[in-house]
């Protein structure tokens, strides 16, 4: 039962029960609480809310389903909103017959949605009026529910916001799916060959898809959007607060009006009660007097004395009248003094108004002076223009004069007094006139030089400036005086208001005194009339009527006692008491008339006694009245003194608060101006640096660098860093290539030496063969000379490129340092601006925000220090690389010297062999011709290969053109994004202006609220004065004050709740940031697992021809270059089609495949820019050029280095300018022992005799000594296969005998590379 009672006491259930009276349907008016779960009442309420209610004609649909459909349609059609929260479960509502906790929670959801429909419908006023009539607790809880619906997005959202969020979610899901599809497509393409044109087109489509993918917004844009959202939320809250305050003010005004009306009614009742009390007192006094008179009438003694006392009483009354007149005169004098004070105050006000008029006049004069200054400036500009024009005219005249003064060279003899002479004379006269005018103009110009005019103008300007400065100083002083006068004016206005209130009180007092005076005069007249009547009726028969009068007096006394008891017991029955009092007055009048007749018969002594008694009673009453008046006046004076002291204290406190607020506002405005200036400077510096970086990027892109879409400056810097590191890697690879070439040449020289020794041994047997062999050797020697020369040239080029790259690295380092400084400065400035904004909005939250920002700044500083350490480490690594390059250069020079010596020795030996081979017979010439034919056939094959390579080169050109188009499109997209950024900045600025305007409006409303609060305080003061007079009114005022305190406590509680909500939002933001970082890490992990197209090398040629073709430098057709005829020897179709060695992605990601030229590298090699630029494994064979974070370094060291491709060959450089731009991966590591050995690779390994020098077949062979014959001479094809390559793979059998047929072993999964040679 308690739970049911608590459920029905819930505000939403109470509201629904109250709404049953509004609905016109009669079935709902007879509503019972047991029928709550039927749903009829809620459905009828929805019909009342929505006039366009459309009932569904479906038979199987329940009432709750129909109700929910109508609610959702109402939100969508009328309010443009969507219900986001979890809808109430209809099965629970229909199944449960009684109201449990679960069913009531579902009903709460439904009632909440119904309340939102009711408050936002056309019948809004009806529901609001009903809600305002509830208790305060229910009102507060219903208001919280309404705020949940209107302000938060947990229950209901706008359609536009909902659609935007859905679009964002679909975009994010589509972007992730596209990246996965790219990975899958790359995996599929890695398993197939990449030599055909169709596969190149597919790769272009993939690249265009990746480039066209929408980029994620930058951190600055996200920060700006978050700031805008926070500002909008604050705006909404401020609006709701302002509306709530306006409503509260209206309610308070209505309450005050009602209370004022009640106070007036109570005052009227109090006055009536006071009058009734006075009359009752007068009746009691009359009764007592009558009793006294009756007692005194018994004693007929001293009648003469009474007559005398009556005379004295008249004199006393006269004296009292004089006293009252004097009091009236004193009051009139006080009124005159107050009127004088009023006049003085009015005079002061007039003087102040005159001062204000003077100020306005001064302002007008200042405006006139500014207008005159502007006119004078315009006149000065006109004068300067005229001066410039006069100078031009003078120059033109000077030129004309100079032309006129030039003597004519052709002098022809003419006849005197002829027409020609006359014309010449006329011309001369005109020239003289012109000269005279020119002289005059010169004199004028010399008399009024431009310097004098400029000096005069400058003097005038100085005077005007001095006048302006003085006037500005005067205006500043006047402004200060005006402010002071305004403060004094406000003080005087306050004093005037107080004086007016006091005057009103004094006027009320004067009116009361006048009324009292009139009443006293009336009483005197009535007393005289009664006294006369008493004297007239005294002569009648006292003895007859004495018994009757005694009886009547006894009755009257009894009746008075009964009336006294009734008045003490029942104060509420005033009407009855008034009627009884009237009856008593009538009876008393009759009794007085009768007693008057009795007293006439009495003697004068009784009259004297009566007069004395009356005088004494009047004196006592006058003294009591005076005492009461004095007490009231003292109390009033004390209250007014307290009021004045309190007002003075309040005024002083307000003045101090104003001063402190003004100082704080000035300081904050100065800080804001400084911060804005610093921001402008930092933005300009940042823009300059970004421009420099962009220019550097353009130069790098012209030189062949590839850039992706740049979203941030940090990404741009990272791209530049990657390009520099790639360049260094390329230099390293070239160094390795040169080293390999040197080793190849040394090996060839050793082969030549062996061949020469063989020739010496077989001089007698093969003289004819040696002649052809010598020719071949001479040709090879020529080729070696050319190779040495080319090596020297390449070394020089490398040195030059190294120097230029070092300079570029230094420049980039400087720019990166400047960017880091600017970024730190911008971060600090943004943080300070945010702090200032938060301090202006909420002074209580300022300290917490400052602490949080300090922690953030410390973290940022630590991150920057870590970044600087990393950069210093990178610099050290670059220096080490430079040193190693120098050492390699010295070694190459030594090798070059050794080669020259060997070449000289070989030359001498060839000369000796020529002398010996002259005697060789001609029979072996036929054999040599056959060899020549075979070589020609090989040449034709190479020519066909060259044609194929040319075709591939054309395809590469087409691909380069497509890439250029993509770059132009990227530039256009970047421009569009920059425009959008500017627009976003403009919108932010406009919104800031709107916020400032709303703040101004808020300040105005706060000032109005303060005025209203001051009025309320004045009313409360009046109420206090009335409370002192009446205790009941004081109790009511205390209740009002307690209600006020409760409202203030609620407001403070709401502020605390708002503060907690802000903290929750900040925590949610931090959680979102962490989630974002985790997502970025996951994306980077996906990018690391991506596989690129791989290609396998073709069958290799003999060593000598391959080395010769690798070292011949041929010009490329385009700037990017393509492959030449020598590239055919690098990669074959077999190398491209080789499957991967292992099934995992980690084994493949270490080494990308190499290519024959830079264009093939762009097509086939992996896109390093697509990977994370920070991932470079330092422990790898690449010499620390690839960076990797600490968490990935250990994973790579533990695995065996395996690659699905053949090792690199000697690349061919076609031109010295583009040789440094082509990057090749280094060869595989030497003598590297893997940490984890795979058992499959070791168990199924079977070496081949002709490929591995460590085989068991070759161990049995021994080296043939001098003078001995070989047991076995290899065929020519076998020798060619031997010298084909210095790296070859050993393939396993596809199905070993030990393994079963259904095993999952791949054909090339456990291949192992063996190396031999002299590298």
Swiss-Prot record:
What start-end ranges are recorded for coiled-coil regions in this protein?
A: 141-173, 218-690, 732-1096
Q: Does the keyword Coiled coil apply?
A: yes
GO CC annotation, single = centrosome
Instruction: Note whether Cytoplasm occurs among the keywords.
Output: yes
Q: Name one GO biological process term.
A: ciliary basal body organization
Instruction: State any single GO MF term.
Output: dynein light intermediate chain binding
Q: Which family does it belong to?
A: Belongs to the CCDC88 family.
Per the entry, what this protein does is:
Scaffolding protein that plays a role in ciliogenesis, cilium positioning and dendrite anchoring in sensory amphid neurons including AWB, AWA, AWC, ADL and ASI, the phasmid neurons PHA and PHB and the gas sensing neurons AQR, PQR, URX and BAG. Its role in cilium positioning may be through regulation of the localization of cell adhesion proteins such as the apical junction protein ajm-1, and the ciliary scaffolding protein Rootletin/che-10. Plays a more prominent role in regulating dendrite morphogenesis in AQR than in PQR neurons. Regulates localization of hmr-1 to the distal AQR dendrite.
Q: Which PANTHER family match?
A: GIRDIN, ISOFORM A (PTHR18947:SF28), HOOK PROTEINS (PTHR18947)
User: What's the protein here called?
Assistant: Girdin homolog
Q: Which organism is it from?
A: Caenorhabditis elegans
């Amino acid at each position: 039962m308690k739970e049911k009672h608590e459920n029905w006491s819930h505000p939403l259930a109470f509201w629904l029960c109250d709404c049953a009276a509004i609905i016109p349907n009669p079935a709902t008016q007879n509503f019972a609480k047991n029928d709550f779960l039927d749903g009829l009442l809620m459905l009828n309420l929805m019909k009342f809310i929505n006039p366009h209610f459309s009932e569904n004609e479906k038979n199987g649909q329940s009432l709750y389903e129909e109700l929910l459909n109508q609610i959702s349609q109402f939100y969508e059609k009328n309010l443009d909103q969507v219900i986001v929260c979890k809808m109430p479960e209809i099965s629970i509502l229909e199944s449960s017959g009684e109201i449990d906790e679960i069913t009531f929670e579902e009903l709460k959801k439904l009632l909440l949605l119904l309340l939102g429909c009711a408050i936002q419908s056309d019948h809004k006023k009806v529901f609001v009026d009903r809600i305002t009539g509830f208790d305060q607790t229910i009102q507060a809880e219903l208001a919280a529910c309404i705020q949940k619906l209107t302000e938060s997005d947990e229950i209901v959202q706008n359609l536009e916001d909902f659609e935007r969020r859905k679009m964002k979610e679909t975009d994010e899901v589509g972007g992730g799916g596209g990246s996965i599809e790219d990975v899958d497509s790359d995996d599929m393409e890695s398993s197939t060959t990449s030599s055909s044109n169709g596969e190149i087109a597919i790769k272009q489509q993939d690249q265009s898809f990746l480039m066209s993918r929408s980029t994620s917004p930058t951190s600055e844009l996200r920060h700006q959007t978050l700031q805008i959202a926070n500002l909008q939320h604050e705006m909404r809250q401020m609006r709701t607060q302002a509306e709530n305050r306006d409503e509260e003010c209206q309610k308070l005004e209505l309450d005050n009006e009602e209370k004022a009306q009640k106070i007036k009614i109570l005052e009227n009742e109090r006055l009536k009660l006071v009058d009734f009390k006075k009359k009752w007192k007068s009746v009691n006094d009359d009764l007592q007097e009558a009793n006294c008179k009756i007692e005194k009438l018994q004693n007929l003694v001293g009648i003469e004395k009474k007559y005398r006392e009556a005379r004295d009483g008249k004199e006393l009354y006269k004296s009292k009248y004089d006293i009252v007149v004097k009091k009236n005169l004193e009051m009139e004098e006080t009124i005159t003094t107050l009127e004088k004070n009023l006049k003085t105050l009015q005079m002061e006000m007039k003087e102040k108004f005159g001062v204000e008029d003077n100020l306005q006049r001064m302002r007008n004069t200042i405006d006139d002076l500014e207008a005159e200054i502007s006119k004078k400036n315009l006149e000065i500009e006109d004068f300067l223009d005229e001066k410039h024009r006069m100078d031009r005219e003078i120059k033109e005249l000077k030129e004309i004069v100079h032309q006129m003064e030039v003597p004519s060279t052709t002098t022809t003899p003419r006849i005197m007094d002829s027409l020609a002479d006359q014309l010449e004379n006329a011309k001369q006269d005109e020239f003289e006139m012109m000269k005279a005018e020119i002289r005059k103009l010169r004199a004028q110009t010399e008399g009024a030089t431009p310097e004098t005019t400029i000096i005069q103008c400058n003097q005038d300007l100085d005077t005007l400036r001095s006048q302006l400065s003085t006037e500005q100083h005067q205006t500043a002083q006047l402004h200060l005086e005006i402010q002071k006068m305004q403060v004094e004016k406000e003080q005087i206005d306050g004093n005037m208001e107080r004086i007016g209130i006091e005057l009103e009180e004094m006027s009320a007092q004067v009116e009361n005194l006048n009324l009292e005076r009139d009443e006293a005069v009336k009483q005197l007249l009535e007393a005289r009339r009664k006294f006369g009547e008493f004297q007239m009726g005294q002569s009648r028969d006292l003895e007859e009527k004495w018994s009757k009068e005694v009886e009547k007096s006894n009755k009257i006394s009894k009746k008075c006692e009964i009336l006294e008891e009734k008045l003490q017991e029942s104060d509420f029955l005033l009407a009855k008491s008034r009627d009884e009092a009237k009856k008593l007055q009538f009876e008393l009048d009759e009794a007085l008339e009768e007693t008057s007749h009795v007293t006439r018969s009495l003697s004068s002594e009784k009259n004297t006694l009566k007069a004395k008694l009356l005088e004494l009673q009047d004196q006592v009453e006058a003294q009591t009245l005076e005492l009461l008046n004095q007490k009231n006046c003292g109390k009033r004076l004390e209250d007014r003194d307290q009021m004045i002291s309190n007002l003075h204290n309040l005024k002083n406190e307000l003045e101090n608060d104003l001063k402190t607020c003004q100082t704080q506002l000035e300081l904050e405005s100065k800080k804001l101006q400084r911060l804005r200036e610093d921001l402008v400077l930092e933005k300009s510096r940042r823009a300059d640096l970004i421009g420099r970086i962009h220019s550097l990027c353009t130069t790098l892109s012209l030189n062949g660098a590839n850039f992706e879409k740049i979203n941030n400056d940090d990404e741009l810097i990272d791209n530049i860093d990657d390009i520099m590191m790639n360049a260094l890697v390329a230099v390293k690879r070239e160094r390795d290539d040169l080293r390999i070439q040197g080793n190849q040449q040394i090996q060839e020289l050793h082969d030549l030496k062996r061949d020469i020794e063989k020739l010496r041994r077989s001089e007698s047997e093969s003289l004819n063969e040696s002649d052809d062999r010598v020719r071949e050797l001479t040709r090879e020697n020529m080729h070696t000379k050319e190779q040495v020369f080319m090596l020297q040239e390449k070394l020089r080029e490398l040195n030059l490129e190294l120097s230029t790259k070092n300079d570029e690295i230094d420049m980039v380092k400087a720019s990166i340092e400047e960017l880091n400084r600017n970024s730190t400065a911008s971060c600090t400035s943004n943080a300070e601006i945010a702090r200032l904004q938060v301090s202006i909005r909420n002074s209580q939250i300022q300290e917490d925000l400052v602490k949080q920002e300090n922690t953030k700044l410390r973290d940022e500083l630590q991150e920057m220090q870590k970044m600087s350490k990393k950069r210093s480490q990178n610099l050290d690594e670059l220096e080490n690389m430079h040193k190693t390059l120098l050492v390699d250069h010295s070694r190459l020079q030594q090798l070059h010297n050794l080669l020259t010596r060997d070449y000289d020795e070989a030359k001498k030996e060839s000369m000796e062999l020529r002398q010996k081979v002259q005697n060789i017979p001609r029979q072996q010439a036929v054999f040599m011709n056959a060899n020549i034919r075979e070589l020609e056939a090989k040449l034709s094959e190479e020519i066909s290969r060259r044609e194929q390579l040319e075709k591939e080169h054309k395809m590469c050109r087409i691909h380069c053109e497509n890439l250029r188009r993509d770059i132009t499109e990227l530039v256009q997209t970047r421009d569009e994004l920059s425009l959008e950024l500017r627009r976003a900045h403009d919108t932010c600025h406009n919104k800031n202006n709107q916020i400032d305007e709303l703040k101004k409006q808020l300040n105005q409303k706060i000032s109005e609220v303060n005025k209203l609060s001051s009025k309320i305080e004045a009313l409360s003061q009046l109420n206090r004065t009335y409370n002192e007079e009446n205790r009941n009114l004081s109790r009511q005022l205390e209740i009002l004050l307690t209600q006020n305190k409760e409202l203030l406590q609620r407001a403070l509680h709401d502020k605390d709740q708002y503060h907690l909500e802000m903290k929750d939002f900040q925590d949610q933001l931090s959680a979102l940031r962490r989630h974002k970082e985790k997502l970025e890490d996951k994306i980077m992990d996906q990018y690391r697992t991506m596989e690129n197209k791989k290609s396998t090398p073709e069958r290799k040629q003999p060593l000598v021809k391959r080395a010769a073709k690798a070292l011949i430098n041929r010009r490329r057709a385009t700037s990017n270059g393509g492959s030449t005829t020598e590239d055919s020897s690098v990669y074959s179709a077999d190398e491209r089609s080789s499957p991967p060695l292992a099934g995992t992605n980690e084994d493949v990601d270490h080494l990308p495949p190499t290519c024959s030229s830079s264009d093939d590298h762009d097509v086939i090699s992996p896109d390093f820019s697509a990977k994370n630029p920070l991932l470079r494994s330092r422990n790898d064979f690449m010499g620390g050029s690839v960076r990797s974070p600490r968490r990935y370094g250990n994973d790579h060291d533990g695995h065996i280095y395996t690659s699905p491709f053949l090792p690199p060959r000697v690349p061919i450089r076609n031109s010295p300018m583009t040789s440094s731009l082509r990057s090749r991966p280094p060869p595989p590591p030497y003598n590297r022992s893997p940490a984890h050995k795979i058992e499959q690779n070791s168990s199924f390994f079977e070496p081949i005799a002709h490929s591995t020098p460590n085989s068991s077949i070759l161990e049995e062979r021994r080296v043939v000594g001098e003078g001995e014959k070989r047991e076995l001479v290899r065929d020519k094809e076998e020798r060619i296969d031997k010298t084909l390559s210095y790296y070859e793979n050993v393939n396993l059998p596809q199905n070993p005998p030990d393994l079963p047929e259904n095993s999952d072993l791949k054909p090339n999964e456990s291949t192992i590379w063996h190396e031999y040679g002299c590298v």
